[in-house]
Amino acid sequence: FRSDLGVDIELSDIVQRMRFEHPEVKVVVMRSGKDQVFCAGANIRMLGGAAHSHKVNFCKFTNETRNTYEAALKDSGQNYIAAVRGACAGGGYELALACNHIMLTDDSSSSVALPEVPLLAVLPGTGGLTRVTDKRKVRRDRADIFCSMEEGVKGKRAKEWGLVDEVIPNSEFNETVAKRAKELAASSNKVAGQGIMLGPLDRQISDDGSISYSLIDIELDRKFRKATITIKGPENSPPDNGEALTKAGDQSYLLKLARELDDAILHLRLNEMELGLWVIRTQGNPELVLTHEAALLSIKDHWLANEILQLWKRVLKRLDVTSRSIIAIVEHGSCFAGTLAEIL
């Protein structure tokens, strides 16, 4: 498949749903539905005609998606394997690099490559070189040669250089991938209960672009290039045990708010790029916010509580690296406490 924004939106959604809807899954195999190509990388024509700001947002979002499944083993006990058959180039190899284990078939057409420098005179945009040298510990001289080779590296050399973890004969590839996935699943000590369904977000967009969620309102002031984000505090007591939290599902306050805030950040980033100032306000009872946080932390070893905490970590990181001027206003009636105080 081709690494485009639409593909990464779907990939991000899949990774999130694997954590919340299928916590019983221990190994995820990432492979292509086509025989001759694993992933061809970014849509060069799309990027060639795109504004610089869109390119920045595209690369930032795709790297955030890769960071999410790269950390899935440590944070959620889900191991990602890249089963590479065919060309794996540019953003396609960066997809594989974020996995915990890369398996490459040994045939005449399968290779890994970062051809951005020889083809486009730009560096890989979503962490390719960093993961090659810092994560996979490829020698710097080999990394220099590798990123200057348009044709990439195949077979035994890819394994010898550390660009992949395994090279498998084509006739044994599918069998070996399945075997390796079973081995990794068997070695996992991940314990999880029944997953929850992540339903559609309740989002309404008015004619002037203002946005309303169930827990967030966003007002746009285009004259002053400003977006005012108002977060509502909880109204009810929190679930106090894992069973109650699971029963609440995607309607539990901290999970619902995290999903809505994440969606709001991405919407403003990609669709309202002229709004350079974000003002964040809160309304509600700070004591009740603290109660919700304390209840979640008291059961943090429960799989769903852990996933909600990990989601908040990702949302706050996304906010932190967003290229906007962001101001938080703490005033009478606000509820910047506990988890919401992290926004400050």
Regions found by a protein language model. Name each.
Residues 4-53, 63-83, 105-109, 226-229, ...:
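A structural preference for short, pocket-lining loop segments at secondary-structure junctions
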Residues 1-10, 79, 104-105, 117-125, ...:
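Charged, low-complexity, helix/coiled-coil-prone segments
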Residues 45-47, 107-111, 131, 191-197, ...:
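Generic detector of short, locally flexible boundary/turn motifs and exposed helical patches
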